[in-house]
């Protein structure tokens, strides 16, 4: 009689154990999925920056980046930019050395004469260093688009130039997030631009 009761007791314990285990796993699953999905949503939340004067929009991550615009006076580059927008990491943007820290993405706008082809303009501006790989880029509203890649060089080693009748837009990503922001760049249709003051 004792063997039977012992077997019965064992099977009872197995049953109870099994029930507890299955309850535990469902609780764990519910908890797991809710914690997994929430942080992803927060980091991916992007805001759109729209520049009506120069006719473009770009999405960025406001939690991580701050948008800084340089006045044309500050942009002592050749050729000289009429507008420059930098997306700087927030932890770097507060310091004194903000101008020396690379941004996530830099967008520069240059005026262009429409009769010149984009690659001629890049060449004459010294923006195609030796060893550059050049490929074409397509985007709505863009007449010509070129990507200049320098594989031998550390970042920034990718430069995207997009041209319409009035401007050349230069986009330079410095990191992976900058690359994502670059891919969100769009030109505004003519109707939604502010009319240029000449």
Please place each PLM-identified region on the residue numbering:
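Bacterial N-terminal signal peptides that target proteins for export
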Residues: 1-11
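Bacterial signal peptide processing site
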Residues: 24-26
């Amino acid at each position: 009689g004792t063997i039977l009761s012992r077997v019965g007791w064992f099977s009872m314990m197995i049953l109870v154990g099994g029930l507890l285990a299955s309850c535990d796993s469902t609780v764990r699953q519910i908890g797991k999925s809710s914690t997994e999905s929430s942080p992803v949503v927060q980091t991916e939340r992007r805001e759109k920056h729209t520049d009506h004067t120069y006719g473009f929009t770009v999405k960025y991550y406001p939690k991580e980046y701050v948008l800084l615009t340089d006045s044309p006076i500050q942009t002592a580059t050749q050729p000289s930019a009429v507008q420059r927008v930098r997306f700087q990491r927030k932890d770097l943007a507060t310091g004194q050395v903000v101008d020396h820290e690379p941004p996530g993405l830099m967008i520069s706008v240059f005026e262009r004469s429409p009769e010149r082809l984009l690659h001629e303009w890049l060449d004459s501006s010294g923006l195609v260093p030796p060893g550059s790989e050049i490929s074409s880029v397509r985007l709505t509203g863009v007449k010509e688009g070129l990507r200049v890649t320098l594989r031998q060089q550390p970042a920034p080693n990718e430069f995207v130039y997009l041209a319409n009748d009035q401007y050349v837009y230069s986009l330079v990503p410095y990191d992976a997030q900058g690359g994502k922001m670059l891919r969100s760049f769009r030109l505004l249709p003519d109707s939604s631009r502010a009319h240029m003051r000449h």
